[in-house]
């Protein structure tokens, strides 16, 4: 398929490279055209343009000026841009798209915004797909887990794209009783979750769960990190803090990095996030290069809001969100563990 890619940063470049490796033709546009040219020279994209209008033209036709009449076929356009720029990017793209085109939003948009956008575009004859995308900077090698929302026809048209981006069936053992049965998209690492907004809704909850898991790791490693507090204990301490009953019980000088490495093998708490945590702790056991305050990008808040709207208890996710708020005041080691993980899986600037 011929695809137009808007946004060629960490995620966009990796996605483009996977698509090209699978035989697709990817033409890109980014604000930094010089960088886009460099990506073209490295064959990370099939071509680059200096404008959104030019991108639409090249996706639809290899010659001539695009009009409603001379468009050869509907175009597929992927937006991999920050949530706060989706609306402006979409508005610019809509100036040049034609009826039948498909626009895929791979960002972390609020699912309510995705529903609104899909309804708006449907009145123009343009199909909108919201695609929650997980995988971060490792997606190029591991593949991207995709949570898709939109009309059946649009999703079916774009299935070759999703198949190319997803990790594939070999990424995990098949669950019980599936051997020999028909293979489904979710076994390849992508799912058509439902109508417009469903993809971003599922991705929102995914990120809420991520908050909770990361917080549990951070708190556990913080306890290990402080396990030698008894050796530093001063009996005449703060009158507002309950005294430690048996300081001698907490005189363990535990190497947190080595514990993380051990837990990666055979432990029930093993995971990819633990792998990343072990990696960052091995490099800097005290995480001295990481800030103590942890950002929240929005999805955790949206998940808590949805839980309140639905009347569904979510104490772990809520607590993890509150902890991120508090971390920006305290700068504790637990917050540095969280930032270490975020830097590893998402390439976030947390120093």
Regions found by a protein language model. Give the residues of each.
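Hydrophobic beta-strand scaffold residues
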Residues: 26, 47-48, 103, 128-129, ...
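Rossmann-fold NAD(P)-binding glycine/threonine-rich loop
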Residues: 102, 106-155
